[in-house]
Amino acid sequence: MVTHGDKIMYRISKVLNHNTVIGIHADDNQEYLVMGKGIGFGKKVSERFEVRDGDTVYSLQATSNRGNAKELATSIQPIYLEIANEILDEAEKVFQNIDRAVLFPMADHLEYAV
């Protein structure tokens, strides 16, 4: 599941960097990767926050041949997650509709290639 700015409350599970956190959704108690400018800045574990317009939310429930999404999200350096997200943002501008489920494999590939 990927949503943009759904205005639902989350609770911080882990701060990956200033722009990336793992949050627990208030309604379904599932973990999501939330990316947005400064979203993790000054945040502490268990602090509540709201997704803003422009933030991107990725489900951490999916699994692939490289592992589950949460393991990938915490093992990949956050800068590569941000770069992959920016690439997907630009691709979305050109192609309108893209599959954002490629974020984790793309970030993993970028980290390995560099």
Segments the model singles out, each with a brief description of its role:
Residues 2-114:
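A cross-family "folded-core" feature that marks the main globular domain of proteins
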